[in-house]
Amino acid sequence: RELVEACRRNRVDFVWAIHPGQDIKWNEEDYANLVRKFEWMYDLGVRSFAIFFDDISGEGTNPERQTELLNRLNEEFVRVKGDVTPLTVCPTDYSKLWANPTPQGSLAIYGRTLDPSVAVFWTGDVVCSDLTPETLEWVNSRIRRPAFYWWNYPVTDYVRHILMQGPVYGLDTTLTADDLCGLVSNPMEHGEASKLALYGVADYTWNVAAYNPIDNWERGLALLAPEVRDAYRTFAIHSCDTETGYRRDESWETETFRLADRTPERAAALRAELERVVRVPARMEQCANKELLAELRPWLVEFGKLGERCLRALDLMELYAGGDDAAFWASYVANRMTPDQMKAYEAHKSGTMKLQPFYEQAMDDMASGLFERLTGEKPAGCKGIGSFQNLRTTLSKLMFDHDSTTHYTSGVSQQDGDWIGADLGCVRDVHEVAILQGRNSVDDVDFFDHALVEASVDGRQWTALGDSLRTVYDIRWTGEPVPARYVRLRRLESPRTHWASVRSFEVNPVRAERLGFGVEADDLTAALYAFDRNPSTSFLLDGALRFGVPAGAKGYTMLLQPDADAAPASVRQYAADGTLLSETHVDAPLFRLTLESGAARVELEGALRIFEIIAE
């Protein structure tokens, strides 16, 4: 009752909505229970009501039954009361993505049979999508009335680790009351942090034709946090994108770059912005809106850390260019994110479009460059490619992290011809491909149920690796080597409209039998990553690792990260008969070992992370 009265004082219609749910029976008992609840809410002051038939299956989806119920409620409750606003309904077919477009579809049935006063929700072409004349024309021609647009923004129930703080855009400014009867915004669970977006939605609906997203955003920042407006703006401009699904522009005033494109001017400009980022958490503590600050604080903490590691990555670029490999690698491993740091960032992300990718790409580029400088060859790592837009983001790295509990997801519905793949960086002889589709291998729906593995030298002409696959989660191809730079899994004809997910995408995974020397460790599978010619992977040693010396080897360069809290790791060399030839200790992250004459086996014992062991 308090909420209803507060809404009335502020000229807001409080709408009470009910979801009849999966178990509706369409009988008199159900109807009587529904009316009874309406009466209870009416007695508390509610004068606006809605019924939702979204996200259900079974008998509850029957559009004829739905319209019969709505028409009866309209006749026996709304009109009888006299002071109740027209009903609102969310149909089961609330998105073009799965709506039946035919005259027999539920939307067309709504158009023919539903009382014209009832407003009908519509989310657009997909669940989260822009408000366009085209989507309204499509739905309005079927429901025979202007739709009530349900805009799923700034809601983050599908990306709870994100705060949507960017400008409100994607709303067409040529629309009139003939096109839509209303616009409802679905906010985040963070009420204060949602106000920046709601301010934009309110501004748009107040004067559609004159709405300007950036002008509105700038005013909203000053209105919500005037005393820390600049700091709030710095955070907000880097906290806009979802990374998946409904992508939003972010960091549009910031230019980032790859290692090869670094110039002093670009580095100086980025450094200035990153220094502003680092100052944001402390400055935001002066925000007078303590509820807003409390909601933002977990993200602000991680935002400051993001700025710090990006600044260190800039410094590392200079150190890398200087050519002192030992000094560079020592600073490099100190700037790597630990599992705990990554977990904290993943829970409260910002800077996902430019800042975190800058950090990750800079670190990857420098590690790859160092490997190439040490060996004269390109590392064996992969990067994600494909038809889905977010494969260009750092999300695609989840396919290559050797962790089957994580997964890349497309964030949008799959279609025939879609594909997910790997760029090997150069042409290699491909002899094995191993792919884990879906979020699990048992009953997940987010996978290509009809697909083909293919390889290509140039990305234009593709060769099939094996036959087409139907309903296969765990894919493995082996065969005679095929020269290729690109390997992909391409969807073939299928009615499936789910997202697509991949837990693992391996090309030529390292195998003990292919190394040419023996390896012994408690966890042999993990230990092989020390020899996979890819410095982006690593093996956490806590014990002993033993490996044979290949013919012709004179020494090793080891890319390591010693455990600062543990004793220095030991390195021992043994002859073929087991005689100990020498023993030393790891004294630097980039450790060089000269082999003794007759050395046949090396043993590394201690606690440290091994990125690569390179024979020379």
Feature map (PLM): residue ranges:
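Feature activates predominantly on carbohydrate-active enzymes
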Residues: 1-30, 37, 43-47
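Catalytic-core regions of glycoside hydrolase
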Residues: 37, 44-47, 56-218
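Short loop/turn motifs at secondary-structure junctions
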Residues: 45-47, 83, 179, 429, ...
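Disordered, acidic Ser/Thr/Pro-rich linker "stalks" and the adjacent N-terminal cap
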Residues: 371-430, 436-450, 467-468, 497-499, ...
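Trp- and acidic/polar-enriched beta-sheet ligand-binding modules for extracellular glycan
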Residues: 442-507, 565-616
